[in-house]
Amino acid sequence: MNPSLSVFTHWNDESNQSEIFSDPVISNCEKILRFLAPEFLHSLELSIYLVNDSLMAEINEERRGKPATTDVLSFPLYSEHPPIPVQILGEVVISMETCKKQAMEIGHGLVDEFYRLLVHGILHNFGYDHETNEEDALLMRKMEDECLDLVFAT
């Protein structure tokens, strides 16, 4: 069964909308979520926030007690056994300022870096974790590659 999907995008700085457009983000999230979603779900909801470094630092301090900016944060609400077949997956927050800096440092495009961060955040919302042990890190990396292949398939 293919779940119905709701993806919500929110910007705190409209200048980012000229580089990352909402419609492709939503359609690419739908590809990723359909790939990752368990069969029993009837619907799945995800919120994506694109923010500047200042707001990211505020969110990071408020939600994690770390008063610094970062590239991506995930706040999962996912449960493997929800009481009903409707699931609010969680939130992904991406600092577009940090995303731009990292893209330049790494030497690839902003869109590539944006989707790398988005996929990373979505996977965390599904319970993947690269910090527990090497095996989990390798699995998460494999899933990141598979999701990015879906996004960038020609």
From Swiss-Prot:
The protein's name in its UniProt record: Endoribonuclease YbeY
Protein's GO biological process: rRNA processing
Cofactor or coenzyme needed: Zn(2+)
Any single Pfam family the record assigns to this protein: YbeY
Biological role: Single strand-specific metallo-endoribonuclease involved in late-stage 70S ribosome quality control and in maturation of the 3' terminus of the 16S rRNA.
Name of the coding gene: ybeY
UniProt cofactor note: Binds 1 zinc ion.
Annotated Gene Ontology cellular component terms: cytoplasm
Residues annotated to bind Zn(2+): 120, 124, 130
Natural source organism: Leptospira biflexa serovar Patoc (strain Patoc 1 / ATCC 23582 / Paris)
Matches recorded under InterPro entries: MetalPrtase_cat_dom_sf_prd (IPR023091), YbeY (IPR002036)
Family label: Belongs to the endoribonuclease YbeY family.
Record carries keyword Nucleotide-binding: no
Subcellular localization, as worded in the UniProt entry: Cytoplasm
Taxonomic superkingdom: Bacteria
EC id: 3.1.-.-
GO molecular function: metalloendopeptidase activity; RNA endonuclease activity; zinc ion binding
Keyword terms of this UniProt record: Cytoplasm, Endonuclease, Hydrolase, Metal-binding, Nuclease, Ribosome biogenesis, rRNA processing, Zinc
